[in-house]
Amino acid sequence: MFFQLPWLPEFILRRRDWALLVRVLRNTSSPGVFSDPDLEQYKQSWGKRGALTAMLNWYRAALVRPSKFALDSEASRVKLPALLIRGKNDQFVGEAMARESLHYCDDGHLEMLETATHWVQHEQPAQVNTLLSQFFA
């Protein structure tokens, strides 16, 4: 609910050279995944005008504005093939949530990468690329 506040999250996240966001990336990823140069690049991106608010607005909208489609309606179904790649050690998207997401897909597939976290594309890019190539083939 913290992100629902109008300006305080932006203020706090910018403090101390983005220390909280840097800590989140480092503490929720495998060691060494986000190097100091990577984090400097992230800080530059976060600092661009409107970028941080845009990041937070996704969470704000997801919690405040219910979807115009009921989750059990035909309009809410994903009819195209869908692939969800999840790290087994993801601290943000639980395994149950990932599996339940497939119930909204006519042709959904879940790939669990044993040693990855939420940042699966950063931690195991070759494996993610292989899975995507196979999926789109």
Which functions belong to the PLM regions below?
Residues 107-137:
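Catalytic active-site module of serine/aspartate enzymes centered on a nucleophile-bearing elbow/loop
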Residues 1-112, 133-134:
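Flexible "cap/lid" subdomain of the alpha/beta-hydrolase fold that forms the substrate-access gate
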